[in-house]
Amino acid sequence: SDYGKVYDTFYKHDITHVVHLAAETHVDNSILDADAFLRTNIMGTHNLLKAALKFEIRRFHHVSTDEVYGHLEKGDKKFSEETPYDPRNPYSASKAASDMFVRAYGSTFKLPFTLSNCSNNYGPKQHKEKFLPVVINSILNGDKIPIYGKGANIRDWIYVEDHCSAIWKILTKGKYAETYLVGSNCEKTNLE
């Protein structure tokens, strides 16, 4: 979130497109201490937006999360790009705020942007604090599997390479100022 470093990077390289994936993402950490989430997810995004505007990039793609929409349980209607935001924790609130900054730069300064809200990624080298690695490691170690709440929350899972393909398609063919909901229709409750 250091604007000087961001500016220098834009200055030294001929950057024409930004795909913004940088974020603090672990919900539990955001509940314990939200400061890093404010710095990285909100101020970090703001600094990238300022540099993107200054250096007149051709496209700014912001990768966000479906967590900004709240949560789903069995029988609930699926999220869509028109679903109102309903963040339920400091992490999702910080991502919702960064989404709003991107949209504000688009409408105020005409920054060419696209935005995607993606479901839960899984795949190689996933951080050990994420849900699937925690469950797998708990099983391997003979530990109790942690379940949040009653385990009824629904998560859609997407393989990381499929998410990357979606980002590329949005970056190259997406319509400016549009939001794209990225998922795989692989919905499971935490208990499943």
Task: Describe these PLM feature segments.
Residues 38-41, 91, 136, 183, ...:
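Amphipathic, non-transmembrane alpha-helical scaffold segments
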Residues 21, 101, 134, 166-169:
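Generic recognition of well-ordered alpha-helical segments
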Residues 96, 114, 121-134, 141-143, ...:
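Glycine/proline-rich active-site loop of Rossmann-fold NAD(P)-dependent oxidoreductases
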Residues 5, 47-51, 157, 162-165, ...:
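Conserved mid-core alpha-helix of short-chain dehydrogenase/reductase
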Residues 1, 32, 40-43, 82, ...:
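Residue-level signal for the nucleotide or nucleotide-sugar donor/cofactor binding architecture
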Residues 1-121:
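N-terminal Rossmann-like NAD(P)+-binding domain of SDR-like oxidoreductases, especially those catalyzing
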